[in-house]
Amino acid sequence: MLSTILRNNFVRRSFSSRIFSQNEYETAADSTLERLSDYFDQIADSFPVSEQFDVSHAMGVLTVNVSKSVGTYVINKQSPNKQIWLSSPMSGPKRYDLEEEGKWTYAHDGEQLDSLLNREFRKILADDRIDFSRHV
């Protein structure tokens, strides 16, 4: 029983067999945060959003204040762990690891960052045209 739990846990958490250098991680994380920041700005220009909708990106931290009723998303680099951390007012905190193909994946359930953002922002804005897949 214990070996099955440990084996399943190991399988679930081992998405990438490649170890990224610190420089590769920093480049990927910075690029991801920049693309996300640009897309959130595009969302503000292209979709009906709250007057409180605000995007700020500085020093490895992207903050998106959606509205008073929804709350604030914070997406940031966690360089010591080579991760991107997300704090979502809808789904809570998550830690994403970089996969070989350049996608950020949450080890606990295998969901990728773009998939979670698609689901949550499509619900928030009631619009299926939201698509983070090219921006993460």
Curated annotation (Swiss-Prot):
Q: Which residues form the signal peptide?
A: none
One Gene Ontology term, aspect cellular component: mitochondrion
Q: Please give a single GO biological process term from the UniProt record.
A: intracellular iron ion homeostasis
Give me the reactions it catalyses.
Answer: 4 Fe(2+) + O2 + 4 H(+) = 4 Fe(3+) + 2 H2O
Keywords from UniProt, A to Z, are: Heme biosynthesis, Ion transport, Iron, Iron storage, Iron transport, Mitochondrion, Oxidoreductase, Transit peptide, Transport
Its subcellular locations are: Mitochondrion
Q: Name one GO molecular function term.
A: iron chaperone activity
What broad class of enzyme is this? oxidoreductase
Q: What is its EC number?
A: 1.16.3.1
Q: Which CDD domains match?
A: Frataxin
TM segment ranges: none
The UniProt entry, under InterPro entries, shows: Frataxin (IPR017789), Frataxin/CyaY (IPR002908), Frataxin/CyaY_sf (IPR036524), Frataxin_CS (IPR020895)
Q: What does this protein do?
A: Promotes the biosynthesis of heme as well as the assembly and repair of iron-sulfur clusters by delivering Fe(2+) to proteins involved in these pathways. May play a role in the protection against iron-catalyzed oxidative stress through its ability to catalyze the oxidation of Fe(2+) to Fe(3+). May be able to store large amounts of the metal in the form of a ferrihydrite mineral by oligomerization.
Note the subunit structure: Monomer. Oligomer.
Q: Name the family.
A: Belongs to the frataxin family.
**Name of the featured protein:** Frataxin, mitochondrial
Q: Which organism is it from?
A: Caenorhabditis elegans
> What are the top taxonomic ranks of the organism?
Eukaryota, Metazoa, Ecdysozoa, Nematoda, Chromadorea
Q: Report which gene this protein is encoded by.
A: frh-1
